[in-house]
Structures are given as C-alpha cells and as structure tokens.
Amino acid sequence: RDGALHNTTTGRRISAVVPMHTFGHPMQIEALIDVAKEFNLVVVEDAAESIGSYVGSTHTGTFGRCSSLSFNGNKTITTGGGGAILTNDAELAQRIRHLATTAKMPHDYEYIHDAVAFNYRMPNINAALGCAQLSRLDDFLSAKRVLARKYAEGFSSARSMQFVAEPHGTTSNYWLNTIRLNKPDLSLRDELLVAARASGYMCRPAWNLLHTLPMHESAPRAKLPVAQNLWQSLINIPSSARHYLGQK
C-alpha cells in the first residue's frame, strides 16, 4: 500500500532487502533490483563471500545502495578479520565512517559522541595485510577456477549428485565449492559427510536455516520449501586452491 511493501502479519513497512551471493555465486541481482525499484526497497548486498565475482562485467556488491565484504580468515582474501562496506553514496559513506569511529565529534580536547556507536575501525596492520592480499586477488581467483574446473570434471559422471557451477552470464569466485544431491536426502547427506571426514576430507553441510534456530522461533516466517530442500541437499567440499596458484 502507498507504493510500499508491508508485512501482512505485523503491518510494519518493509524498507530493505538483503540479497546474498552465496558461496561466491552471483544471485539474480538485476531481477531483484527491478522488483526493489517497483516497491521502493533499498537493496543492501551481502557480498561477504563474493569478492571477484561478476554479473556480466559488473562486480557483485555494486548494484545496491551499499554492500558488505568480508575479510575473515577463510575468505578469498583476508585481513585476519573484519571487512568493508562499499557504496557510491557519499553521504551514507560519511555516516558509516562516523558510526564506525564511535560517533566521535570533532573537538580540540573533549570526548563528545552524538550517537550510539562502536569502534569498528580496521587497525592499520590489518589494512596493510589486506592491501598485500588485494595485489594477489587475480592469482587467487584463477587458482579457484582451476580447482572448480577439476571438481566439475570429476563430478560430471556422478549419478546422485552434481557440482554447483556458476549461474549463466556470471563469473563466480568459487569461494566455497559445493555439491548438490539430485534429490533432497538428509540421511544420505549426513552419510556422505561422515564418510568424507573419516577419510580425512573436511566437508560440511550448508548453514542451518535461520527460522529453525531457537532465537528466531518467535519471528514471523513463511514456508520455505526451496531453502529446506537445499539444506538437505548441499555439501561444501574442500576449497583451498593454493596448490593451483600460477595455473590457468
């Protein structure tokens, strides 16, 4: 109503949508942007896993009003922790910097804060590590694609599962390689996980769905059959590509 979306249960206006480029694979962001424009929704991209991934020639994280990147220790590049926010909105960028610096107001000697905020600034030593990592990003991405290609070839003849490849028209960084069972089967998924770990291969399931976690049990929800099926079907497989650095 009034050109905006509202939650039919609570009546609250829905102001933003947060799409995620899961495992580094770009989602259908252009279609989502069109829907967001129709209903006056702000798009905040979760690009934590997708540095180096593209839709056509456009990098993920540059479609919405802002986006987040992760530089956690397990990501494609790392600063040891933390991340970055991308935006081309100068006013928003200044607001983010202010809140990430304890909302401290300029003053010769007083400590004056004009908002509830936290100290989220990245230490210089971590930023220096990040700059060094960025200089090798192309090498890391190439190695990731070599590994993904080998996985795709290896699973091409599998009958009960398939390798999850980048969507058509996109370039994925293949941050976390994944296989998908052809039919959702929690027992088979767990059997494969146990067998892989027993053989020395560190594999894991996809995350538990948020609406199934105890702290969200009272939150509004809808039926999510696609998410449920994926949870029962996906297995993340070893994704370190260090052995393929320098290969193409």
In which residue ranges do the predicted regions lie?
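PLP-dependent aminotransferase class I/II
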Residues: 2-12, 16-20, 25, 29-31, ...
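Conserved active-site segment immediately N-terminal to the catalytic lysine
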Residues: 16, 45-79, 108-114, 162
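Glycine-rich, phosphate-binding/catalytic loops in enzymes
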Residues: 34-37, 60-61
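Hydrophobic "anchor" residues on beta-strands that sit immediately upstream
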Residues: 41-42
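Conserved phosphate-binding and hydrolysis motifs of nucleotide-dependent enzymes
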Residues: 57, 83, 119
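Active-site PLP attachment segment
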Residues: 62-101, 124
